[in-house]
Amino acid sequence: MTMEVDILELSDRSAKFVLSRVSMAFANGVRRAMIADVPTLAIEYVNLYDNTSVLYDEQLALRLSLIPLVTDIETYMPQAECEVCGGEGCPACEVSLTLSAEGPGTVYSRDLISSDPKIQPADPNIPIVELKKGQKLVLEAIAHMGYGRDSVKWQAGVACGYKNVPVITIENCDACGHCAAECPKGIIRVEEAGARIAEDDLIKCSLCRLCEQVCDINAIKVDFYENAFVFTMESDGSYTAKDLTINAANVIKGKAEELLAILDQL
């Protein structure tokens, strides 16, 4: 049985698609891979040379670490897995970002200067700190590749979730309209022949079954496909939504190949 993917919505930061002919365990595996197993770049160390702002050094370091960075997974690798330096830190596993600012004014993520032009803050307008007249901030930040399972700052996937594809059948409807009034999604339309749901709207059903509960004659039944899922995901900007989904699939593929290699040795 071959897996099927039907893309419903796709933008740089978000996607919605139907994943069919897979188990719930597989769908959850894709979700977990997006959140925890796709490595991203995030600031790990901060060397502060001058900080006369109102924020403590630790507060600044925390804010910097949570700024999403555009990640090039083909160029960089997690430091612990780096074959070039053995985890000591080198251009293959880390990026340097510098910042020098003087008040008055607000320091933004766009003020970080990266040693690699490809690695930039995913959003240039994230405020870091406001500097008053005479206040300064001079620092160097070191970004490492890491996994979301180790820290939230390395989570590329946000708001990743899925639900079963709904199946709704309507038979012998008396067009009372109770189901339409109760539906929180507003997808049920009542016509002279009875209630109906447009095919394009069916995917919006939240499976709450409120329509089913208020129908006195049991004309409407809500069910779902066990092997088809509506998948919704957002990226923090480290990757595009498309690239994050592909990278998550590659992670699952790599784990499966690793398992097969181990089994072949038995």
From Swiss-Prot:
Q: Which reaction does it catalyse?
A: RNA(n) + a ribonucleoside 5'-triphosphate = RNA(n+1) + diphosphate
Record bears the keyword Glycoprotein: no
Tell me yes or no: is Transcription among this UniProt entry's keywords: yes
Reported cofactor(s): [3Fe-4S] cluster
| Positions of disulphide bridges | none
Cofactor binding mode, per the note?
Binds 1 [3Fe-4S] cluster.
Q: Which Pfam families match?
A: RNA_pol_A_bac, RNA_pol_L
Its top-level enzyme class, in one word, is transferase
Under the heading PROSITE patterns, the entry gives:
4FE4S_FER_1, 4FE4S_FER_2, RNA_POL_D_30KD
Q: How does it assemble?
A: Part of the RNA polymerase complex.
Q: What is the name attached to this protein's record?
A: DNA-directed RNA polymerase subunit Rpo3
